[in-house]
Amino acid sequence: MGKTAIFIFTIINRILKEEIKGDLACLVLCHTRELAYQISKETRRFCKGFTEEINKNMRTILLIGGDNEKDQIKDLKKKPKIIIGTPGRILSLTKKNNVLNLNNIQIFVIDECDKMLNALGKFKIFKNFKLYYILYI
């Protein structure tokens, strides 16, 4: 939980200080569904202590294979600040018109990047990012 807490608190802090503008602020990419689920669960737990208004502005969604894609598309329409997901599902949703646009992501976290680098080689979805912060965990 230590490294997860560090990068999640950093993301939350930057969003709260309004250093990050726009709807979608952060993408956390994980090499497994289980890891993505764990990080999503921890992020929601960390945000529970905030007021309802802050919690609403800190909307987090989980985009992983095996979950209902139509439900995930509905969640994306609610304009999340943080997306946590796996490369396959992220790629799938970026290929659908007007579903997921990653051009304005300002923080991109690759969790367990040593295991992720091989997977990223297979996906060419992150080529035109304007990133202000990149955290390799």
Feature map (PLM): residue ranges:
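Conserved helicase ATPase motor motifs in RecA-like P-loop NTPase domains
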Residues: M1, L27-R33, I110-M116, K130-I137
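Short coil/turn segments at secondary-structure boundaries
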Residues: I8-F9, S40-K41, D75, G121-K122
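Conserved nucleic-acid-binding Ia/Ib motif block in the N-terminal RecA-like helicase ATPase lobe
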Residues: I20-K96, N104-I107
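Conserved protein kinase catalytic domain
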Residues: I12, R44, F126-K130
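Walker A/P-loop
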Residues: M1-I11
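SF2 helicase catalytic motif II
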Residues: I90, T94-Y132
